[in-house]
Amino acid sequence: MGVVLFIFLVLFPLATLQLDADQPVERHAENKQLLNPDERRGIILHALRKRCCHSSWCKHLC
């Protein structure tokens, strides 16, 4: 009886929590795939144009 309670009260909730943790990552990946290629290209080009720091902070690292 104790083993059955342990399984249902401890192990089963732990297994379900682990599965719930995977869902936001999959949802984020689905959102990225829904972008059309032009939007995706614009996001990537915008990110590439950004500098890593201001010129007054670093001169040769960027």
Curated annotation (Swiss-Prot):
Endpoints of the signal sequence: 1-17
Disulfide cross-links: 52-62, 53-58
MF GO annotations: ion channel inhibitor activity; toxin activity
One of the record's GO cellular component terms: extracellular region
Highest taxon above the source species: Eukaryota
UniProt keyword Transcription, yes or no: no
Propeptide: 18-51
Tissues in which the UniProt entry reports expression: Expressed by the venom duct.
InterPro entries in alphabetical order: Conotoxin
UniProt keyword Secreted present: yes
Cellular localization per UniProt: Secreted
UniProt keywords, alphabetically: Cleavage on pair of basic residues, Disulfide bond, Neurotoxin, Secreted, Signal, Toxin
Role summary: Shows excitatory effect on mice by intracranial injection, followed by rigid paralysis of the rear legs and recovering after 30 min.
Domain notes: The cysteine framework is I (CC-C-C). Alpha4/3 pattern.
Stated family: Belongs to the conotoxin M superfamily.
Protein name per its UniProtKB record: Conotoxin Mr1e
